[in-house]
Amino acid sequence: SRGLGDVYKRQEKTLYNYIESGALSVKNIDLPKKVKYKVRSCSSSEAADLTIYEGRTYKDYQAFLKEFPDTRVTEMDTVLGCEGSKKVLLTLHFDCCSLMMAYLLDSKEVCHVKAIFDSIERSLGTFSFSSVFPLVLTDRGGEFRNPAALECGQENLIRTSIYYCDPMCSWQKPHCEKNHEYIRKICPKGTSFDDYSQEDITLMMSHINSSPRQSLGGMSPLKLAKLMLPSEVIDYLGLTEIPDDEIVLTPALLQK
């Protein structure tokens, strides 16, 4: 059916999970690859294992998109505070609409990144998570260096696929890097995130995502996202559309 084909194009291994869970009326025995596919554990022992990049390199990412060009891509990164600042921002950039969300992490560790993924999945459900985040491109920072923990969701179902830029090649995720410039207008380098709350960060992202972009034909990322992303995702993000004449993209926005 067309629905089955759509899921397959997004992510083959996610399709097998849907079949296994009974969401689709196909049996695993009809799919030989499923028998051979081993569900990976979410063990933290992989954190420093360079074999984690096998099948997840930037070249693999390009090959996947060449075969499935309509796949939604999310670029992921972190924004650091000043020296001595413990908290960091996890940023998720939806390439389809240029919307970026940021989450405050207690520290730059994979367990905190996983906690954000888990929270989103619990709210949206595994199927919706996989639909919205079928493919995530990030760098090789230590906070992302446990793909199994990020890819595995509830009941060990694969919820996404993680791919990595080449070493020292952050330019391979240009949309994320470009949007960080908006964050730096409000939180310049040297800013500590330790005194901010998630409410502060969400307010900042509401202003950033309400800002019209020439690259979007004068639309804002938030307006475009409302057309491109499921409504439950927009609701979950908790962003507020700010009128053009009230948008603040300076440090004054978060001054206590």
What label would you give each PLM region?
Residues 9-66:
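Basic, flexible linker segments flanking DNA-binding modules
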Residues 189-256:
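C-terminal domain-tail junction helix/linker
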Residues 71-81:
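Two-metal-ion RNase H-like nuclease active-site motif
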Residues 138-140, 145-153, 162-186, 194-206:
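RNase H-like two-metal-ion nuclease catalytic core shared by retroviral integrases
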Residues 2-8:
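Short, small-residue-biased leader/transition segments that mark boundaries at the very start
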Residues 81-85, 102-127:
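Active-site beta-loop-alpha junctions of metal-dependent nucleic acid enzymes
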Residues 66, 79-101, 117:
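Short conserved beta-strand segments at catalytic cores or DNA/RNA-binding microdomains
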